[in-house]
Regions:
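A short glycine-rich, His/Asp/Glu-containing loop-to-beta-strand
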Residues: 1-29
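Double-stranded beta-helix
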Residues: 2, 16, 74-102
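Structural motif
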Residues: 16, 45-47, 54, 70, ...
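Short beta-strand segments in beta-sandwich/barrel cores
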Residues: 18, 27-28, 44-49, 63
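Short, conserved beta-strand element in jelly-roll/cupin
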Residues: 21-23, 33-48
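Short beta-strand His + acidic residue motifs that chelate non-heme Fe in jelly-roll/DSBH
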Residues: 30, 48-49, 65, 70-76, ...
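A cytosolic small-molecule/anion-sensing beta-strand core signal
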Residues: 42-43, 58-59, 77
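Short acidic-glycine-tyrosine-enriched beta hairpin
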Residues: 52-67
Length: 102
């Protein structure tokens, strides 16, 4: 996707799962989507940025982001993040993910 972020994903009829490999300093710009999102950090840590707060999520932790909530993230170190989305990410399936491509 860019020099600091790569993604693998698979979608079924009702959900999408993606694995993001993020190098330290990688940024996911502020965005929102119709999907509920569960972010499970396998290694490393991310700082999620919301309108009213920031949340640090480290290895072994999971964060739920409700649908339509604007958010962004910064990798505080090299990070492996598995994201679960429901319903599935139709925008990603249509390759409408330019905000991640930097």
């Amino acid at each position: 996707m860019n020099d600091l972020l790569s993604r693998q994903m698979i979608s079924g009829e009702n959900a999408t799962i993606s694995q993001l490999l993020m190098k330290q300093g990688a940024v996911v710009p502020r965005h929102s989507h119709v999907n509920e999102q569960y972010s499970w950090i396998l290694s490393g840590s991310l700082k999620f940025i919301f309108d009213d707060r920031e949340i640090l999520v480290g290895a072994g932790e999971v964060l739920l982001i409700p649908a339509h909530v604007p958010h962004g993230a910064v990798a505080l170190e090299d990070t492996v993040d598995v994201d679960f989305f429901a319903p599935r990410r139709e925008d990603w399936i249509r390759k409408e993910d330019s905000y991640l491509r930097g």
